[in-house]
């Protein structure tokens, strides 16, 4: 049986989201149809506003409404440390911990030969430029996930940054291999930052 075009389009739209297959997309489409019209309108407005009003900070690559983002604009933060993460959501996780008070830099991914993603596809050039322009930065903490791609990216960054005389450290491995920062609890993250090791 073929679905009416509006439902088919809704299913196709949901399937573009990560981790959503045909079954889940169909379930979400029918759930959306059952929602009150006001709720659907509010949801669609929120989607449009997020896409229209949010962009990447020109300094660190975080998601923000203003430029620079509130973290880069905050002069009370420790200007000597930059913690490098894969995605903007990782910053939210680190900030929840309330133990790290330095700056951030978002790579927007990791190097992955399988996906055809090299250093030029990541937000690395702006990190190097930032380090060259800011002599206050004394340490770069690499907080890529403990996956083969995250480790390879960390090693690449270390080799790139160390010759400039900047200390490069890696989060301690309280994070299990293959785990994402996003899913780590606050105490594990705190221990990982505290026990970071020099690369």
From Swiss-Prot:
Keywords, alphabetical: DNA damage, DNA recombination, DNA repair, Metal-binding, Zinc, Zinc-finger
Q: List the cysteine pairs that form cystine.
A: none
Q: Which SMART domains match?
A: TOPRIM
Q: Name one GO biological process term.
A: DNA recombination
What is the annotated role of this protein in its UniProt record?
May play a role in DNA repair. It seems to be involved in an RecBC-independent recombinational process of DNA repair. It may act with RecF and RecO.
Record's superkingdom?
Answer: Bacteria
PROSITE patterns given in the database record: RECR (PS01300), TOPRIM (PS50880)
Any single GO molecular-function term of the entry would be: zinc ion binding
Q: Where are the zinc fingers (C4-type)?
A: 57-72
Q: Where is the Toprim domain?
A: 80-176
Q: Which organism is it from?
A: Levilactobacillus brevis (strain ATCC 367 / BCRC 12310 / CIP 105137 / JCM 1170 / LMG 11437 / NCIMB 947 / NCTC 947) (Lactobacillus brevis)
The family assignment reads: Belongs to the RecR family.
List the HAMAP family hit by this protein, alphabetically.
RecR
Q: What is this protein called?
A: Recombination protein RecR
Check the record and name the InterPro entries matching this protein. DNA_Rcmb_RecR, Rcmb_RecR, Rcmb_RecR_Znf, TOPRIM_dom, TOPRIM_RecR
Q: Does the keyword Nucleotide-binding feature in the UniProt annotation?
A: no
């Amino acid at each position: 049986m073929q679905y009416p075009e509006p439902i088919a389009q809704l299913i196709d739209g949901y399937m573009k989201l990560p981790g959503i297959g045909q079954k889940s997309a169909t379930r979400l489409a029918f759930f959306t149809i059952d929602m009150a019209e006001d709720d659907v309108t509010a949801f669609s407005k929120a989607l449009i506003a997020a896409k229209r009003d949010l962009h990447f900070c020109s300094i660190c690559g975080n998601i923000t409404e203003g430029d620079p983002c509130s973290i880069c604009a905050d002069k009370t933060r420790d200007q000597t440390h930059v913690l490098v993460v894969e995605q903007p959501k990782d910053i939210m996780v680190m900030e929840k911990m309330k133990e790290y008070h330095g700056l951030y830099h978002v790579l927007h991914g990791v190097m992955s030969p399988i996906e055809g993603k090299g250093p030029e596809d990541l937000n690395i050039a702006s990190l190097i430029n930032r380090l060259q322009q800011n002599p206050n930065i004394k340490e770069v903490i690499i907080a890529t996930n403990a996956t083969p791609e995250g480790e390879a990216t960390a090693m690449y960054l270390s080799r790139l940054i160390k010759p400039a005389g900047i200390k490069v450290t890696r989060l301690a491995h309280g994070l299990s291999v293959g785990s994402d920062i996003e899913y780590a609890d606050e105490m594990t993250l705190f221990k990982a930052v505290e026990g970071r090791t020099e690369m």
